[in-house]
């Protein structure tokens, strides 16, 4: 059926993983507040759909991490790219808000540019870590680049990209409460040793990270018989996706919580957290943590050749030094995970030093109001 143009303003939004979905949803709320009647279509997760996005495809179909993981999904991903291009040509949105996911969104931006549709890109690609030459491509296809890390804006100087640091969306969050308050909110016993495990929002991350996390939990329980383990289930996942892994540890007390990652980490004495946005989300709760990640051997080999940074964890990058342990690939073993968590549980000086450094990271994220500033940028380019 042919699309019938609406009298209201309409924009295109594309967001992939859970954090991008959350940031985009908050921006859409601000856009609707500033411009009543504004509508949006595109690709998003549950939070964007709840905010009113007309989803032409779910975020889960384009949110894939790692070269080996992407290859079998290429036909579907390219199909969505073509479908969005056709929808944009037909509907002629007044602007596009593309959030993160550079390998997909920069290709889409090139198509939108040919259609004369202004593009606002939210969450800069990590050109400071690898493929700095992408800045030239960005300059050709993006009208406004909105950065969420304080050091990113300067990497665009002299490239022709109109970039602005808008503050980090997580700066909206109030200072964390006590572990006991979060345990009470989650229905957890207040006096027990509590360990959070954050395995990620993608099936591939669950497959690689949850089994060694659960093995580490078994080791920690042996040293702390009162220990309870809590896992937030990302909005992009179903609880059933975790069941096969939990089935191998029936005697281990693992509490699943839908979403609410910050509360789960806030309830913890220490946390195992997958690398990515989750590390910053967890770090803002000012709880000791260990960062872990595993890629396929092929994806990791390619990453080692291309990525030139000293640290992987976002909190370490922002701090400019290693403030939290990073366990990658073979080092992300149950033995190492359990040993690092045990150190944080037992060494008061190590705990306090890490928490003090995380306070510095929290202070570096800018002032609250990022969703409003992004919404204003989108309205500023609308035709």
UniProtKB/Swiss-Prot annotation:
Annotated GO CC locations: membrane
GO MF term set: lipid-A-disaccharide synthase activity; phospholipid binding
Gene name as annotated:
lpxB
Q: What is its EC number?
A: 2.4.1.182
Pfam hit, one = LpxB
GO biological processes: lipid A biosynthetic process
Name the protein family. Belongs to the LpxB family.
Identify the domain of life: Bacteria
Q: What is this protein called?
A: Lipid-A-disaccharide synthase
Cite the entry's keywords alphabetically.
Glycosyltransferase, Lipid A biosynthesis, Lipid biosynthesis, Lipid metabolism, Transferase
User: What species does this protein belong to?
Assistant: Anaeromyxobacter dehalogenans (strain 2CP-C)
**Reaction catalysed by this chain?**
a lipid X + a UDP-2-N,3-O-bis[(3R)-3-hydroxyacyl]-alpha-D-glucosamine = a lipid A disaccharide + UDP + H(+)
Instruction: Report the pathway entry.
Output: Bacterial outer membrane biogenesis; LPS lipid A biosynthesis
Enzyme class name: transferase
């Amino acid at each position: 059926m042919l699309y019938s143009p609406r009298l209201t303003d309409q924009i295109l939004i594309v967001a992939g993983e859970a954090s991008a979905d959350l940031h985009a949803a908050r921006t859409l709320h601000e856009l609707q507040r500033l411009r009543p009647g504004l509508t949006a279509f595109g690709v998003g997760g549950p939070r964007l759909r709840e905010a009113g996005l007309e989803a032409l495809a779910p975020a889960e179909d384009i949110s894939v991490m790692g070269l080996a993981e992407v290859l079998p999904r290429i036909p579907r991903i390219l199909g969505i790219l073509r479908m969005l291009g056709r929808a944009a040509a037909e509907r002629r949105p007044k602007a596009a808000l593309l959030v993160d996911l550079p390998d997909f969104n920069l290709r889409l931006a090139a198509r939108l540019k040919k259609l004369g549709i202004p593009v606002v890109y939210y969450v800069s690609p990590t050109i400071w870590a690898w493929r700095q030459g992408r800045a030239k491509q960005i300059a050709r296809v993006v009208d406004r680049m909105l950065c969420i890390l304080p050091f990113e804006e300067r990497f665009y100087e002299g490239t022709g990209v109109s970039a602005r640091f808008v503050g980090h969306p997580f700066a909206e969050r109030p200072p964390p409460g006590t572990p006991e308050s979060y345990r009470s909110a989650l229905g957890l016993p207040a006096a027990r040793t509590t360990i959070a495990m954050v395995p990620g929002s993608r099936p591939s991350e669950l497959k690689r990270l949850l089994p060694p996390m659960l093995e580490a939990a078994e080791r920690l329980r042996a040293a702390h018989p009162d220990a309870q383990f809590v896992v937030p289930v990302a909005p992009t996942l179903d609880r059933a996706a975790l069941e096969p892994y939990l089935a191998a540890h029936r005697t281990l007390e693992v509490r699943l919580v839908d979403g609410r990652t910050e509360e789960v980490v806030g309830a913890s004495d220490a946390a195992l957290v997958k690398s990515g946005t989750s590390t910053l989300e967890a770090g803002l709760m000012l709880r000791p943590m260990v960062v872990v990640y595993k890629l396929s051997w092929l994806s990791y080999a390619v990453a080692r050749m291309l990525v030139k940074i000293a640290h992987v964890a976002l909190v370490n990058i922002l701090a400019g030094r290693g403030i939290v342990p990073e366990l990658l690939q073979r080092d992300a073993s149950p033995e190492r995970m359990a040993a690092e968590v045990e150190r944080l549980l037992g060494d008061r000086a190590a705990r306090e030093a890490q928490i003090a450094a995380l306070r510095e990271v929290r202070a570096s994220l800018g002032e609250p109001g990022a969703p409003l500033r992004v919404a204003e940028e989108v309205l500023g380019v609308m035709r």
